[in-house]
Design a protein with these regions (language model features):
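Short, basic, glycine/proline-bearing loop/turn elements
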Residues: 16-20, 329-339, 376-378, 428-435
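Acidic/polar N-terminal loop/beta-strand segments that form early-domain functional surfaces
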Residues: 47-52, 83-85, 337-339, 364-367, ...
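N-terminal glycine-/serine-/threonine-rich phosphate-binding loop
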Residues: 314-360
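Acidic/Gly/His-enriched mid-domain segments of enzyme catalytic cores or analogous surface patches
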Residues: 353-354, 359-360, 366-453
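Flexible, charged surface loops at secondary-structure boundaries
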Residues: 38-39, 74-76, 101-103, 158, ...
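Catalytic cores and adjacent flexible loops of soluble metabolic enzymes
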Residues: 1-331
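Gly/Ser/Thr-rich loops at beta-strand to alpha-helix junctions
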Residues: 113-117, 171, 200-201, 228, ...
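Glycine-rich phosphate/pyrophosphate-binding loops
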Residues: 222, 453-456
């Protein structure tokens, strides 16, 4: 049977879940989390970052203030952990950041880019001398073979790190990869091993169980899988599996209570995998952009997937178009958006348009274009993201289309889709210079087009 001495479990809900809440958590929730985990076979709780002030707002658990750590220490019977971002922290910073928490925090983990392992060793040696356990969270596990001397340098970890974590940053490894990586690391270091999985392909559980079966010493999980992008292995799933498979003693009342406590956040943020995360995981592409695109709900899945395909191909964009040069100018333009008022007032707007033959109509979105078919006035259609698909629907595969299409300047971060039948009528703006914000939005594209037409 598995006991806590055979495999250690680290729950990093507060730290990894902070990517959704900006590291703000309600005190009542944190108190319940601490109370419940006291009753569960979890060894470590990772409760945030320690950092100097960063640009923009980041919540309490990104900085893990001393008063909060003291409160957690008072209430938790578990070992407490914070993590440092190696890219932001140097040896000369650790006395300020870690000195005040000696005796409060048990382990300091360091998030490490494999490219900077040597630099991380210097930082970690200083952390170790302060009396902390040290964990190396080495990212981009699926790409380690691309990092020159990284594997051969692992021998230098032995005397410094207590745990060397294999981090599946992209959520794209399979059990076979886990086994091969464990063997590879073991052949170069005697450090205890850990595994941190992501759930893009819903393999976090099997990958973690595989890691346990092949002798890793510590594994990570989070309540309800709360974590960056597609999320992590669910703590409740891991504990349930180990209870059934290995007889690990689990207090299911306490487990159910803490899972229920996070239901509100799960409903609000809806973390978990979806098609874009599956594609990014399968192709070892960064989750940060995907998380931004998915959570804002501004981009369609087609746009996100096209952007990911461009990343995989290492191209800025999949298509370049001729630059839009306004052959006609218009003292007046009418910009029609995708809202319901453009439908409600279509009849009146059509009468206005007909009364002004020189007026140019700019469709910020093609959503309502069907209501404005057949006009003699020149019409321009802004194609942002997957608007090309919407245009096809509006004009029945574009058999009735008589207009121009304008796209944002090259490169377009979400890639390019232009229906083949209108490609010869499609152009890209040379620039958008009237604003620095939301340059890839429908509104910005429509307004810059109007400016290009010298509209008043």
């Amino acid at each position: 049977k598995i006991t806590k001495k055979m495999i250690k479990i680290l729950d990093c809900t507060i730290r990894d879940g902070g990517y959704y809440t900006n590291w703000d958590f309600d005190k009542t929730l944190v108190d319940q989390y601490i109370f419940s985990t006291n009753e569960l076979p979890i060894d470590y709780l990772e409760v945030g970052y320690r950092s100097y002030p960063m640009k923009g707002y980041l919540g309490k658990y990104f900085y893990a203030p001393i008063y909060e750590l003291e409160n957690l220490k008072k209430n938790s019977i578990k070992k407490l952990v914070i993590i440092l971002n190696e890219k932001d922290i140097r040896l000369e910073h650790i006395n300020d950041l870690l000195g005040p928490i000696v005796g409060i925090i048990d382990m300091v983990r360091i998030a490490i880019d494999p490219e900077h392992l040597g630099r991380a060793l210097i930082l970690a040696e200083g952390v170790k001398k302060m009396g902390f356990e040290v964990g190396f969270n080495v990212m981009y596990m699926s790409k380690w073979s691309q990092y020159g001397n990284f594997i051969s340098e692992l021998k230098n970890v032995d005397s410094i790190a207590d745990y060397f974590y294999m981090v599946d940053s992209f959520g794209g490894v399979y059990p076979k990869d886990v086994i091969e990586t464990i063997d590879l690391v073991r052949s170069n270091t005697s450090c205890k091993l850990g595994f941190h999985g992501h759930n893009n392909l819903e393999l976090a559980l099997i990958n973690t169980l595989t890691a346990i079966e092949h002798g890793v010493d510590i594994v990570d999980a989070t309540i309800s899988g709360m974590g960056r992008g597609a999320g992590n292995l669910k703590t409740e799933l891991l504990l349930t599996a180990l209870n059934a498979k290995e007889g690990l003693d689990v207090n299911f009342n306490a487990l159910g209570t803490v899972v229920n406590a996070f239901d509100g956040l799960l409903e609000k943020y809806q973390w978990g995998t979806n098609l874009p995360y599956m594609i990014s995981g399968s192709n070892s592409l960064p989750q940060k952009d995907v998380m931004d695109w998915v959570t804002t709900r501004f981009y369609s899945f087609n746009s996100i997937i096209r952007a990911l395909q461009n990343q995989k191909a290492k191209v800025k964009d999949n298509e370049r178009l001729p630059v839009f040069e306004a052959k006609d100018t218009a003292s007046e333009v009418l910009i029609i958006g995708g809202g319901k008022t453009a439908v409600e007032h279509a009849q009146g707007l059509i009468e206005l348009i007909k009364s002004k033959p020189e007026l140019i109509v700019i469709h910020a979105s093609s959503k309502n274009a069907t209501h404005y078919k057949g006009l003699a006035n020149k019409q321009i259609f802004c194609l942002v993201g997957s608007e090309g698909h919407r245009l096809e629907k509006a004009f029945e595969d574009l058999g009735e289309f008589d207009g121009l299409c304008v796209l944002p300047p090259f490169p377009r971060k979400m890639g390019t889709y232009v229906p083949s039948s209108v490609k010869e009528k499609s152009f890209e703006l040379a620039f958008i210079d009237f604003t620095e914000k939301h340059k890839d939005s429908h509104t910005a594209l429509a307004l810059q087009t109007a400016i290009s037409l010298n509209a008043n």
